């Protein structure tokens, strides 16, 4: 890598926290940031859940650590962030990837499912942003990347809580960007399109729906977890120092059609 590319995109000496890092998109982002030079803190629902991610990072000689945290539990998030700061000294990059989804017609959608999705996808994201943001303000710099969705822009079908939460994530991203931009903290989001992950397994098993969705994607294919790596590195690096409050679509062109 040239000196210019290293200066612009290299993450050596940075501590990157990635939630929902046990598999899928979160694991792909964790590996990408690690290969770019960051120390990676992989967070899952339990320490055991991120063991496979830690193993992959270790094989790539990436300095890393794994933590368990209930994304819906405010006190647990606060404790986790404090422990990370105590053990690693700083947080340079936060990627809020952890999330959940519940499917049901709106008129049958339960309060329990609604609250679970909002707590994990929106409340938990805010708490991580707030607690990591405190440290970044002390440091005088930082990068926050929230994982939004195509449903930050459209309503979807039978996923009212998920759509509401991801719309909220997009607006939260902009609100925090407005507040922290002059403190050298960049807050942005990535909105993935249709990716081959556990969350989309059932959709992909419905051949008719799978073909309908695929035909609408200009690239003609679904994304793979490592397709988010470049976007994550860009938004984590010096190269994006004048990018703030942006929701970056990584969707194969879906929203352009």
Task: Tell where the protein language model's regions lie, with residue ranges.
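Residue(s) in the substrate-gating loop at a strand-loop-helix junction
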Residues: 149
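Conserved glycine-rich cofactor-binding loop
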Residues: 15, 22-24
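Conserved glycine-rich Rossmann-like NAD(P)H-binding loop of the short-chain dehydrogenase/reductase
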Residues: 38-52
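Substrate-binding pocket helix/loop in short-chain dehydrogenase/reductase
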Residues: 105-106, 113-118, 213
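Active-site helix of classical SDR
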Residues: 129, 165, 173
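C-terminal substrate-recognition "lid" of short-chain dehydrogenase/reductases
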Residues: 126, 141, 185, 221-250, ...
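Alpha-helical segment proximal to the catalytic Tyr-Lys
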Residues: 134, 178-182, 241
